[in-house]
Amino acid sequence: MVEPAFYRELAELLPGRVRAGEPMKKHTTWRIGGPSDVFVEPEGREELRRVVCYASRRDAPLYVIGNGSNLLVADGGVRGIVVKIGKGLSRISIKGNKIIAEAGARLAGVAAAAGEAGLGGFEFLAGIPGTIGGAVAMNAGANGFSLGNLVEEVLLLDFHGEFCRKTKEEMKFGYRSSIIQKAPLILVEALFSCYPRNKEEIREEMERFLARRKLTQPLCYPSAGSVFKNPPGDTAGRLIEMAGLKGMRVGDAQISTLHANFIVNLGSATARDVLALIEKAREAVLARFGVELKLEVKIIGNCQAEVAECRSL
């Protein structure tokens, strides 16, 4: 565990915002994860900066999460400080054809605000869980659309507590990637460029995206969305299904019978259960197709023991 002083000092720095031993399963869409040593929900960017500066000064491990929709947390929890960017940093504002959204704004909320303003571009976000911070960081996308294409500029915070702005080009967006994944940077706010569109057309397209998602994805069970990135020219779901793993179950984790790139929690799944299925899917696809699947979900906490156990199954 981190030093007990970390909790006391942060609690004094941000009264009412800090908790010890917070169960991380409450903060991930998989509903999986052990306790974090220290858990902080900042109210605004200045409080976020204070936490980051404190962690840097004390050399404490720091993890930043949003809605936890693309995240697997170890059963043993997280040693360090977990910062959740949520309601305290969720403002959305519209200026002409531009939308400014803070990192904690829900994707569904941004899409709805754009639709109400008659601004197109965010329709593909309909039904996707998550927040702007995580979605921009990983350049989230669906149905051939990617969020990075709409970004004009972002406000970032580095792990030394310094704010900086970067353009779309400087963010170096790629398939499910950006510079945020390769450097100690936190997205604080993003400016998006949209285009005028008929409100009814926006509504109808969002309904089509949502209907398609309901037909093809296991929305009735907790999951983290796509587990693996799609390899060039193919999809991870197809490869896993062709390898015969659709429906495979370990404990209460199951490779979805509806979409093989989803692993669902049927009730009380653990990170160990999920990791076992991840290992089996990787091994089966590599053996049959010679394709090495790469994770799209992020794993935090010490999962080495779980991985070792999974490989022995």
Swiss-Prot record:
Pathway: Cell wall biogenesis; peptidoglycan biosynthesis
Residue ranges annotated for the FAD-binding PCMH-type domain, each copy included: 31-197
Catalytic residue positions: R176, S226, E296
Signal peptide as annotated in the record: none
Gene Ontology terms: biological process: cell division; cell wall organization; peptidoglycan biosynthetic process; regulation of cell shape
GO function terms (MF aspect): FAD binding; UDP-N-acetylmuramate dehydrogenase activity
Subcellular localization: Cytoplasm
UniProt entry keywords in alphabetical sequence: Cell cycle, Cell division, Cell shape, Cell wall biogenesis/degradation, Cytoplasm, FAD, Flavoprotein, NADP, Oxidoreductase, Peptidoglycan synthesis
InterPro entries the UniProt entry points to: FAD-bd_PCMH, FAD-bd_PCMH-like_sf, FAD-bd_PCMH_sub1, FAD-bd_PCMH_sub2, MurB, MurB_C, MurB_C_sf, Oxid_FAD_bind_N
Gene Ontology CC, one term: cytosol
Reaction equations catalysed: UDP-N-acetyl-alpha-D-muramate + NADP(+) = UDP-N-acetyl-3-O-(1-carboxyvinyl)-alpha-D-glucosamine + NADPH + H(+)
Protein known as: UDP-N-acetylenolpyruvoylglucosamine reductase
